[in-house]
Amino acid sequence: MARSRFGRALARVLRRHRLARGLSQEALAEAAGVHRNYVGLVERGELAPTAENAKRIADALKTPLATIISEAEKS
């Protein structure tokens, strides 16, 4: 469960990056090789992504994972 403060911040950052790129959850999921429901769970802060899936999502967003983590830590 990702309901920690960092988990919620990570969820907001991922959603913000997805929307900024004009991607639907489905399009992001397809690009990252994960299920659309997985993206939704992560974005709602209900599930913490594995390190591998976080990297896949960041790559699909064309954003370094370190940038996403840094933004989440600052929020």
Model regions: which residues?
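Conserved hydrophobic/aromatic packing and binding residues within compact polymer-binding modules
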Residues: 14, 28-29, 39-42, 68
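Recognition helix of helix-turn-helix/homeodomain-like DNA-binding domains
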Residues: 33-47
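A detector for short, charged/polar N-terminal pre-domain segments
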Residues: 1-9, 71
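Short basic helix-loop element that most often maps to the first helix and adjoining turn
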Residues: 12-31, 56
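DNA major-groove recognition helix of helix-turn-helix/homeodomain DNA-binding modules
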Residues: 52-67
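Short amphipathic recognition helices of helix-turn-helix/homeodomain-type DNA-binding modules
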Residues: 67-75
